[in-house]
Amino acid sequence: MNRKKILIIDDDPSFLEICSAILEESDYQVDTASSSKEGLEKLVSQRPDLLLLDIMMATMDEGLNFATSMRQSKDLSKIPIMIVSAQPDAEKGYQRSVDKEMDWISADMFMEKPINPQDLLHNVRLLIE
């Protein structure tokens, strides 16, 4: 069976390590990137089955801008995006920005950090299996 590929883009090394371990233990092929620049290079070269994206990295809008660019790309727009954030109420703020400009950005799922391993695996399965 072909292992599903997941790319995680987050500027928190401990989150990358923990999340990777959870997913690899469930037989997913995982790669990580600590910046949107590195993430874009891996996204284009590897074409993962799922992207886990921190919405707020080095700058406030880095994750949102990354998702926006991805959704505007013909080649990358079909890859599911799971947004993750440690910011309280980030989901509400994200939803407001999506509601305003629904035509050009969307994520397939949102999860708040800290991530519950069982919830993460459940949501990953919903998106790619």
How would you name each of these model-derived features?
Residues 13-31:
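Two-component/phosphorelay signaling modules centered on CheY-like receiver
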Residues 41, 64-77, 99:
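Short amphipathic alpha-helix used as the core "switch/output" element in two-component signaling
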